[in-house]
Amino acid sequence: DLRMSRGLGDVYKRQQLQDSTKVMGGNHAMTGRLTLPTDADIIDETIRLKNLLGADALRDCDGTEMPEELLSEPVKKYATYYTTRKDNEWAMKHPEEIQQEYLISNRITARGETLRIRLMEGFHTEQLKVNTLDDPKRWWEVIDRTTGEVVPTDAWEFDEASGEVEIRTIPYHEYTVSFLAFLIWDPVHMYNFITNDWKDTPHQLTYDVRQPKTRQYVKDKLRKWCEDNPHIDVVRFTTFFHQFTLTFDDKKREKFVEWFGYSASVSPYILEQFEKWAGYKFRPEYIVDQGYHNSMFRVPSKQFLDFIEFQQIEVCALAKELVDIVHSYGKEAMMFLGDHWIGTEPYGKYFAGIGLDAVVGSVGSGVTLRMISDIKGVDYTEGRLLPYFFPDVFCEGGDPIGEARDNWRKARRALLRSPLDRIGYGGYLKLASNWPGFIDEIQNVVTQFREIHENMQGTASYVAPFKVAILNCWGSQRRWMSNQVHHAIWHRETYSAEGVLECLSGMPFEVEFISFDDVRNGIPEEIKVIINVGDAYTAFSGAENWIDEKVLTNIRRFVDQGGGFIGVGEPTAYQYQGRYFQLSDVLGVDREMCFSLSTDKYNEKNDDHFILEDIEGALDFGEGTSRIYAQGGHYQILAMDGEYSQLVVNEYGRGHSVYFAGLPYSPQNCRLLLRAIYYAAGMEQEMKRYYVTNVDTEVTVFQKTGKIAVINNSAQAQHTELYIKGKCAYVLDLKPGEMRWVDDMEDR
């Protein structure tokens, strides 16, 4: 339930909030907790659906309006608020305060002693424009990519008329130019414009709220907006100041998308402040990063981590100023976790200081739900479920009902472990209303969501008596964010690793996210199993951290004394001292890099093991990892691909390890991982305290309310048996996708 918003001091405002809490579902368990979008051309249907679905909040969206006729409805009204766009007049008057992005040119090979590089080749000139206002010699960088050396500024010139940089070169060396460009079309507006085929909508310019004139203007504008919109209860900031990196090519296709990217959070004004704060000179290379733009898969440099820290401090402080303004008018402040979220870092040190009432984000999976629901420092969280009501899904050949079902099945697992306070939808409500059967599907989702809250009554679900830790270079700062390219988007290169977090998002474990510094400082006692998953040399596997003596010895000691270690893909990978997996002794496996082909490996499968006891179907390792072989004297191979291994367990002192060649999300792989974790922890007997026999089903227990949820994660009917304390307590036949509530009989 909604709690007291920050910044509301007088009795009248408190009473307003208490009244709204009742409407939001505090006294009506099977209504409320739902936000619906609306628009000017669907007023009557909005009211009908509000009543049908029990919605207690309405919102506008990008490209829609909140009709005046709905302002008197007895629900909360959300207004989407943009701090960086939708005011072209201001942006055009202050071109120097338009937002900027660091770009890197194509890599061009010199064939003589001079070379001209056209900066905007491959970029869309309606989105980006070279910054010619600030000194290129101060803020740009030309690099010889053959040697890695910076080309002196007196060895190149920018020709503004042609948009080219001319460089004195060494023949057959390769060169790039890193340069600043103005974002003259907001990337999200451009995306929506293209997706919805908006014809007559003006392109929305961006402006940088961090800069002095715009900063004051935006604050004054927000005050006036609050005064002009007394009926709006919740200001839904979408979002604050810096867009994640979303760059289009010259054919209006997405060229570079990094949901965690900081490349568009720069300007000379900001960078001069950073230099004073950091105490050293800024280089464009700290942002463009050889053309990788600090993808989250890259091991972050000290300079990039410094930049993130600085941006958090500044962004969160300025965001607080806007939130304080909203609170002064008796309204709530909600942040959308997406779009211009860069610098807020909800799991960073400064986020709680913003003083937000709520966070809302898009739920594309169990992982992305946990990314929202685990956030602290706000009064409530809200998830915008998929599909978004846009024409790219609600069209001929689209399957919005199937997408809604799949989205809900994944989200529901995570909700039962870490519940959102509210759910909602976005887009054009008319599309959803007109699609046969879709509203019925939404009604089912909303009913199940409310049932979860009704049965849990604000209590936590049962978890195993130990913690599981995900180990990577980002640690707790990027909880539930690892191995992702772009917010819940499937990639062939990542799905075999992403499945680990997706499985964990709905499993009965308390999950911590730890960094290599955490390991160096000593592994916390409550952690019983450490998981390392990812490709070699990425931030998620760990790269050079695996040749740090302290990291290796601390983990070896941890496992030797009874801990568990699970590796997926290329864990602990770094070619050094005759090993590729630096903890091959702990894992019982290594990868053949063709350096040891002369050494014979006598690997044989023996699949008689606790981990495989429930498993009937073929094992799925996704893309897998090739050429894995078992080695040592204490391993057991549970699955093989030809002469190489895919699933291996190993004993190491009093501890255990498990290696998976890959682990994409599936109900069966969730069961595999569940068993692997209990085995690695040496606590197999704990697994059947609460347990269901069918791998397509899962169980969540709320001990304090005496309620148990058994869910069917498949699109088929399933038969399952529920065990409590090792004894069969219920025999259940579940419909496709069903959630069944039963009473906990443990103490009866």
List the predicted regions and their residue ranges:
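Extracellular ligand-binding/catalytic regions of CAZymes and related secreted enzymes
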Residues: 246-249, 253-256, 430-462, 503-505, ...
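Single conserved hydrophobic/aromatic residue that forms the stacking wall/gate
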Residues: 1-16
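Catalytic domains of carbohydrate-active enzymes, especially glycoside hydrolases
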Residues: 29, 35, 41-76, 223-236, ...
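Polysaccharide-binding and catalytic clefts of secreted carbohydrate-active enzymes
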Residues: 95-353, 371
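A short, well-structured beta->alpha microelement
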Residues: 34-47, 62-65, 335-344, 501-523
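A glycine-rich, often tryptophan-bearing local segment used as a flexible ligand/cofactor-contacting loop or short
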Residues: 542-618
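The substrate-binding groove and active-site-proximal loops of carbohydrate-active enzymes
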Residues: 32-40, 55-61, 197-216, 299-316, ...
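Hydrophobic targeting/anchoring helices
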Residues: 16-17, 53, 70, 89-94, ...
